[in-house]
């Protein structure tokens, strides 16, 4: 009997070149409630949504919100759960031009970033349960902000800095200038503000001249 040819190794997901080019998503349950986590594979910036009803409708709503904030991703990696394979999700991804990469037993590593994000999300949730056993939402979101500002142990750069070019304000006192944008951006913003101010002055002068002419009639 002839030996069967060995199967080809699974094609690995491509390496991202910029924030939110490639994202990964997964669902998990914590204390009887469903959550969806979506993570950017470039910066490891996580988004964590509570899903009251679950299902594709809520997932699509989460993606729509993310795409309008961070831009439309080229590809999303998920497992084969029905919420990801459902017709509503597939139609949304197709309409927005997003490729869907499904993980499998042979290619489980393609969604490992989402699985890591789930562990981190559960840790954040666990650490912010109040004395009554309920999630302290303010404390949780502050912890999420802090996590996004925490430098990666390997790259030494935080998710926030990779996405925005600076840390985001999380309520922790910082030295002056910590949240300032890049100098080149500041110069462009200053030029824009000067141009706006100039237009306002010209507009005011024209309006004043027009009013004066009316009074002269």
Question: Which role fits each region the language model picked out?
Answer:
Residues 48-70, 82:
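Active-site beta-loop-alpha junctions of metal-dependent nucleic acid enzymes
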Residues 67-73, 95-99:
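Secondary-structure transition/capping motifs at alpha-helix termini
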Residues 27, 41, 53, 80, ...:
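Residues immediately flanking
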Residues 40-50:
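Electropositive, glycine- and tryptophan-enriched low-complexity nucleic-acid-binding patches
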Residues 30-34, 45-46, 56, 83-86, ...:
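Flexible loop/turn segments at secondary-structure boundaries
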Residues 70-85, 111:
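Acidic/histidine-rich, metal-coordinating catalytic segments
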Residues 1-35:
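Mobile-element integrase/transposase regions
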Residues 1, 89-217:
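Domain-scale segment recognizer with a strong primary affinity
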């Amino acid at each position: 009997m002839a030996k069967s040819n060995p199967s080809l190794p699974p094609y690995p997901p491509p390496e991202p070149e910029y924030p939110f080019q490639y994202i990964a998503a997964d669902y998990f349950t914590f204390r009887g409630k469903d959550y969806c986590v979506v993570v950017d594979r470039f910066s490891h910036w996580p988004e964590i949504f509570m899903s009251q009803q679950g299902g594709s409708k809520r997932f699509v709503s989460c993606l729509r919100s993310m795409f309008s904030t961070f831009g439309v991703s080229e590809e999303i990696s998920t497992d084969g759960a029905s919420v990801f394979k459902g017709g509503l999700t597939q139609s949304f991804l197709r309409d927005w031009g997003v490729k869907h990469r499904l993980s499998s037993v042979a290619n489980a590593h393609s969604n490992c970033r989402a699985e890591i994000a789930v562990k981190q999300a559960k840790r954040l949730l666990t650490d912010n349960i109040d004395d009554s056993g309920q999630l302290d939402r303010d404390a949780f979101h502050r912890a999420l902000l802090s996590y996004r500002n925490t430098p990666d142990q390997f790259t030494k750069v935080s998710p926030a800095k990779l996405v925005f070019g600076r840390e985001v304000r999380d309520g922790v006192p910082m030295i002056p200038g910590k949240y300032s944008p890049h100098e080149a951006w500041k110069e462009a913003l200053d030029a824009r503000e000067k141009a706006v101010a100039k237009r306002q002055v010209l507009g005011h002068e024209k309006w004043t001249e027009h009013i004066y002419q009316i009074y002269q009639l």
